[in-house]
Swiss-Prot record:
This is Large ribosomal subunit protein bL12. InterPro entries: Ribosomal_bL12 (IPR000206), Ribosomal_bL12_C (IPR013823), Ribosomal_bL12_C/ClpS-like (IPR014719), Ribosomal_bL12_oligo (IPR008932), Ribosomal_bL12_oligo_N_sf (IPR036235). It comes from Ureaplasma parvum serovar 3 (strain ATCC 700970). The lineage of its organism: Bacteria, Bacillati, Mycoplasmatota, Mycoplasmoidales, Mycoplasmoidaceae. Homodimer. Part of the ribosomal stalk of the 50S ribosomal subunit. Forms a multimeric L10(L12)X complex, where L10 forms an elongated spine to which 2 to 4 L12 dimers bind in a sequential fashion. Binds GTP-bound translation factors. One of its GO terms (cellular component) is cytosolic large ribosomal subunit. The gene is rplL.
Length: 121
């Protein structure tokens, strides 16, 4: 058997049908114990963005129950009456920072019940 050059080998592959190419791939896999499947690189896989474990609670709108919102802000933060009132009257006020997501969702639910809107950032 004479040795094929690379050019001859490529020319022979170009002339094969899809079925013949499939048979060739299977024969190579069997002969050499390899797989034609592309290896999956762990680093190349897209990394899913993890949900933040700690968030900041910002007041978007106090709503109509401003007294209830002020009381809730005082309860959550421990602020005095005037500081809590100022926070309730200022849109975008940071109510609490670095809060666990579960706790932040509970606090958000309390604000929602009062008709206020908060944002978890």
């Amino acid at each position: 058997m004479s040795k094929l050059t690379i050019e001859q080998f490529i020319a022979a592959i170009k002339e094969m049908s899809m079925l013949e190419l499939n048979d060739l791939v299977k024969a190579i896999e069997t002969e050499f114990g390899v797989s034609a499947a592309a290896p999956v690189a762990a680093a190349a896989a897209p990394v899913a963005a993890e949900a933040p474990t700690e968030v900041t609670i910002k007041l978007v709108e106090a709503g109509t129950n401003k007294v209830g919102v002020i009381k809730l802000i005082r309860e959550i933060t421990g602020l005095g009456l005037m500081e809590a009132k100022t926070a309730a009257e200022t849109a975008g006020s940071v109510i609490k920072e670095d809060v666990k997501t579960e706790e932040a969702n509970e606090i958000k639910k309390k604000f929602d019940e009062l008709g206020a809107k908060v944002q978890l950032v």
